[in-house]
Amino acid sequence: MPVPLQIGPLGPSDVEGVRGLARAAETADGVAPLSEQPLLRLSSDEGWLTHVVARSKAGQVIGYAQVDRGGEDASAELVVHPEHRRAGVGGLLLRTAERDATLPQFGGTAGHHGKRLRVWAHGNLEPARAFAAAAGYVVVRELLFLTKPFPPVVAPVEPTPPVTEPVEPAPPVVEPVEPAPPVVEPVETTSASTSGVVSTGSTTGGGSTTGGGYRVRAFVPGVDDDAWVALNARAFAAHPEQGRLTVADLHDRMAEPWFDPAGFFLAEAPDGTLAGSLWTKVEGDDGEIYAVGVDPAHQGRGLGATLTAVGLDHLATRARRATLYVDGDNAAALATYARAGFVPTAVDVQYGKATGGTPVPRALPSR
């Protein structure tokens, strides 16, 4: 039976339907099928974004794909309801995404616009690997999920007061009384003395100073927004997702319940410009190093390591484990995080048509 498709912006009921679909898939698979960015963009009507909804005969949302043509390559994320899999819905969504990847960035007629489609598979589960192989797709990018447990916080234990047994009083001993010597009163003398405690301290405007005159402080909403977006674009100029964040994207994240400016750290250069940043995100027992980046003009000074240490200290009292994502081909970052005690526990992958790429890898354990 043909599956009706709805292509275009989503209304409020559509958004709730897609969120319900994602929850059902996560319950069945043990991993969220859609990442944060597509969920934040469910209500977006940007011209470079396509929403594809598949419905059952009864009108239930049973499949969803989101196609993003804003980057160098088009990327897509898709999900099918667990009760409607192996019925052609996934293939229909993928073919629609492939067609839409050829559209111009801001809509229009399909054609050859140089957009290669990259499809995310979160967790890279066995059904996703089989689906990708059948469609002629191979892995072109790996995003590793690293974790590090924090030692448990042990509350101080109040010492138990000793139990004192009552002591029977000893009978008085009567000694013979010697005659008392004469009492000589001491002569008081007057002397002048001084004592005092000298304390010194310094303030840095709410932050702490690092080597080279850099200062680490917290993000100030409404003040640092534009400067941080510009810094982020410089730090992630080669990153296909992070480097494209806009002020509107920043504000979307600031509206999320997990946002806490006290866990959003900025490194200022001696001249006051932003040189680096680290953003943390706490949800449940997980404390994520959400994004850490350093302006290329300030790299090589240890700012990344300094910011990471500050972030981990912040998270240690707020979460049971630290988490972060890093590209699988970033050997330097992987080595740094391994030395810090992080280990890979899951992987998200991007698939592309088999004109290059690597064989489908074995999935890591679920988060």
UniProtKB/Swiss-Prot annotation:
Pfam families: Acetyltransf_1, Acetyltransf_7
Catalytic reactions on record: 1D-myo-inositol 2-(L-cysteinylamino)-2-deoxy-alpha-D-glucopyranoside + acetyl-CoA = mycothiol + CoA + H(+)
Amino-acid positions noted as binding 1D-myo-inositol 2-(L-cysteinylamino)-2-deoxy-alpha-D-glucopyranoside in the UniProt annotation, renumbered to this chain: 36, 241, 281, 288, 325
Keywords on record: Acyltransferase, Repeat, Transferase
Residues engaged in binding acetyl-CoA 2: 292-294
Coiled coil ranges: none
Example of a GO biological process term: mycothiol biosynthetic process
Family, similarity comment: Belongs to the acetyltransferase family. MshD subfamily.
Protein name: Mycothiol acetyltransferase
Gene field: mshD
